[in-house]
Amino acid sequence: MTIIDASERIAQLRQEIERHNYLYFNEAKPELSDYEFDKLLEELMALEREFPDLLTPDSPSQRVGGTITKEFPVVTHREPMLSLANTYSAGEVAEFYNRVAKLLAAENVHKQEMVAELKFDGVAISLLYRDGVLVRGATRGDGVQGDDITPNIRTIASIPLRLHQPLAGEVEVRGEIFMRKEDFEQLNDNRPEEERFANPRNATAGTLKLQDSAEVARRRMNFVAYYLKGLKDETLDHVSRLHKLEALGFTTGGHYRRCKTIEEINTFINEWEEKRWKLPYETDGVVLKLNNVQLWEQLGATAKSPRWAIAYKYPAQQARTQLCNVVFQVGRIGTITPVAELTPVLLAGSTVSRSTLHNFDEIERLSVMILDYVMIEKSGEVIPKVVRTLPDERPADAHAIAIPTHCPECDTPLIKPENEVSWYCPNEEHCPAQIRGRLLHFASRNAMDIKGLGDALVEQLVAWGLVHDVGDLYLLQEPQLERMERMGKKSAQNLIRALDESRTRSYDRLLYALGIRHVGRATARELAHAFPTLDALMQANEERLAEVPDIGTTVAQSIVDFFAKPSSRQLVDKLREARLQLAASASKIEQVNRNFEGMSLLFTGTLERYTRQQAAELVVERGGRVVESISKKTSLLVAGRDGGSKLDKAHKLGVRVISEDEFMGMM
């Protein structure tokens, strides 16, 4: 291929890829499967490698990341990125509306049209485009200066690297980066329990600060635009600018409305208070802006916020209930967590009977007692939390919560490490709760995926003394299992079969399954690449470990401490005897493709070459996930013999159906 041919093909591929990016992220109308899209991207990247002079910063290939930024440069915003003043009641909204009316009357302006739009619960950023090409992305920072995070911004597919319409000179686009609920849950599922993010906004903020843009690219984030500055025609009103942003390739969320009266504003606010829970992302309020942009400058701003806009914040979903008891749970790494047992109450569409109290300090801060009436809140967090007590309603028989000094499971004196807020049980080898926690983690779907090994059975195995660590699982025999409650011959056979199948799980999944503190799925993969055998990893010191991407001194120390324990070395010996994968297989780690990255697959009918478990393993190893029911979000339905009703449903929903042969070809 000549450089001229390559240039033409590269231009075609870039245009096609950006079109499909826009359809997927902005219109939610994908025309290609993830596999087909990835093939286009692979072709583009191959051509750019072959003809490096044709690589440009606005190429879609630059979204995959790979840049390591040791320190983000500080940049000054062209105009301050002010935060909006918040309101929390209809009365405050009316005060704002009347205040603007008064200011406009002073300017001899009598048309007061407002725009109401949903407030995304994300992280504000500024994008600078020069002659239509993205040249900088920066955080809000203190409003005057922010961090230049351009390498991370380039990885977000809903941000165009080149505007869809030609614009000369410089224009600035501002908006919010956020994470969809589904992507947030998937990210948390792959993190150690103690390092999970509380909500999508925290996950977004933490991701944008990462120094490795390749890791940012792996975490699916989105962008919604709400501000455009630098157009030649500055007379456009706010709604017209939102339309212009959409024409330039951005999504604006689509949920905004012109409002000419305070009644119309209140209608929009009330309408979305309930509807927002059905959205695939978090929204915590409504932003109100004067539609006439020319008046923004005339109305001006205070030191902190503009006078022409305000944010109405929905109250967090709260409910009143009674705290009946507090139990202290012991996690798999020994963390003691107080959990409130509550009178069941309906909150945000579900019945809540338990709520976290986080730690002992939180109990003291809340001054909460047994039998107190409390307010619980659900505001994007993983589980509800107690936010305050109602002391005026305290019953006469309310009594203090007995804070334990010893482990509620094994009676070992608790310890509180320096610089930590939680108390721990140090008896990790013999504490039944910690053993149960490690077994359940080992058997979980993202780890060894041992079907049938649930809470009830694990509790019996530990109570009967049959299992002391995960290595003992592979010594279990059918007759032992048949004697357990609700474990007949068939269930025992199924569990033994599931344990046998787990012996083939990849080395990186085994590393995650070991439950080393601070080692999630992503870190386990990096370790498997850096140390191809478990023996090599066990011999590594902190300095060598810290050289691995995304592993700092804390994680390195945790790994060294884990393998320094005699019990850990004994466990490795058991796993070796059980014939588990203690080394990286070239097919599973080194050379495995990622053809199913981000895809959800469903199997139906009988497969000729694989069991369902084997097929699912192949999908997960290649970046995909296997679902149990079909929906519009399903990427592919793999149809074996006698596919049944799922085939009909797939055709109705427009889900792509492939044969087992096509499935093999994709691998």
From Swiss-Prot:
<keyword id="KW-0436">Ligase</keyword>
<dbReference type="GO" id="GO:0006281">
    <property type="term" value="P:DNA repair"/>
</dbReference>
<feature type="domain" description="BRCT">
    <location>
        <begin position="591"/>
        <end position="667"/>
    </location>
</feature>
<keyword id="KW-0234">DNA repair</keyword>
<feature type="binding site">
    <location>
        <position position="176"/>
    </location>
    <ligand>
        <name>NAD(+)</name>
    </ligand>
</feature>
<dbReference type="Pfam" id="PF01653">
    <property type="entry name" value="DNA_ligase_aden"/>
</dbReference>
<feature type="binding site">
    <location>
        <position position="117"/>
    </location>
    <ligand>
        <name>NAD(+)</name>
    </ligand>
</feature>
<keyword id="KW-0862">Zinc</keyword>
<dbReference type="InterPro" id="IPR012340">
    <property type="entry name" value="NA-bd_OB-fold"/>
</dbReference>
<feature type="binding site">
    <location>
        <position position="140"/>
    </location>
    <ligand>
        <name>NAD(+)</name>
    </ligand>
</feature>
<dbReference type="GO" id="GO:0006260">
    <property type="term" value="P:DNA replication"/>
</dbReference>
<dbReference type="InterPro" id="IPR010994">
    <property type="entry name" value="RuvA_2-like"/>
</dbReference>
<dbReference type="GO" id="GO:0003911">
    <property type="term" value="F:DNA ligase (NAD+) activity"/>
</dbReference>
<feature type="binding site">
    <location>
        <position position="410"/>
    </location>
    <ligand>
        <name>Zn(2+)</name>
    </ligand>
</feature>
<keyword id="KW-0460">Magnesium</keyword>
<dbReference type="GO" id="GO:0003677">
    <property type="term" value="F:DNA binding"/>
</dbReference>
<dbReference type="Pfam" id="PF00533">
    <property type="entry name" value="BRCT"/>
</dbReference>
<keyword id="KW-0520">NAD</keyword>
<feature type="active site" description="N6-AMP-lysine intermediate">
    <location>
        <position position="119"/>
    </location>
</feature>
<comment type="similarity">
    <text>Belongs to the NAD-dependent DNA ligase family. LigA subfamily.</text>
</comment>
<feature type="binding site">
    <location>
        <position position="289"/>
    </location>
    <ligand>
        <name>NAD(+)</name>
    </ligand>
</feature>
<dbReference type="Pfam" id="PF14520">
    <property type="entry name" value="HHH_5"/>
</dbReference>
<dbReference type="InterPro" id="IPR013840">
    <property type="entry name" value="DNAligase_N"/>
</dbReference>
<keyword id="KW-0227">DNA damage</keyword>
<feature type="binding site">
    <location>
        <position position="313"/>
    </location>
    <ligand>
        <name>NAD(+)</name>
    </ligand>
</feature>
<keyword id="KW-0479">Metal-binding</keyword>
<dbReference type="InterPro" id="IPR041663">
    <property type="entry name" value="DisA/LigA_HHH"/>
</dbReference>
<dbReference type="InterPro" id="IPR004150">
    <property type="entry name" value="NAD_DNA_ligase_OB"/>
</dbReference>
<dbReference type="GO" id="GO:0005829">
    <property type="term" value="C:cytosol"/>
</dbReference>
<feature type="binding site">
    <location>
        <position position="431"/>
    </location>
    <ligand>
        <name>Zn(2+)</name>
    </ligand>
</feature>
<dbReference type="InterPro" id="IPR018239">
    <property type="entry name" value="DNA_ligase_AS"/>
</dbReference>
<dbReference type="GO" id="GO:0046872">
    <property type="term" value="F:metal ion binding"/>
</dbReference>
<dbReference type="InterPro" id="IPR001679">
    <property type="entry name" value="DNA_ligase"/>
</dbReference>
<dbReference type="InterPro" id="IPR001357">
    <property type="entry name" value="BRCT_dom"/>
</dbReference>
<dbReference type="InterPro" id="IPR036420">
    <property type="entry name" value="BRCT_dom_sf"/>
</dbReference>
<protein>
    <recommendedName>
        <fullName>DNA ligase</fullName>
        <ecNumber>6.5.1.2</ecNumber>
    </recommendedName>
</protein>
<dbReference type="InterPro" id="IPR003583">
    <property type="entry name" value="Hlx-hairpin-Hlx_DNA-bd_motif"/>
</dbReference>
<feature type="binding site">
    <location>
        <position position="407"/>
    </location>
    <ligand>
        <name>Zn(2+)</name>
    </ligand>
</feature>
<feature type="binding site">
    <location>
        <begin position="34"/>
        <end position="38"/>
    </location>
    <ligand>
        <name>NAD(+)</name>
    </ligand>
</feature>
<keyword id="KW-0235">DNA replication</keyword>
<feature type="binding site">
    <location>
        <begin position="83"/>
        <end position="84"/>
    </location>
    <ligand>
        <name>NAD(+)</name>
    </ligand>
</feature>
<dbReference type="Pfam" id="PF22745">
    <property type="entry name" value="Nlig-Ia"/>
</dbReference>
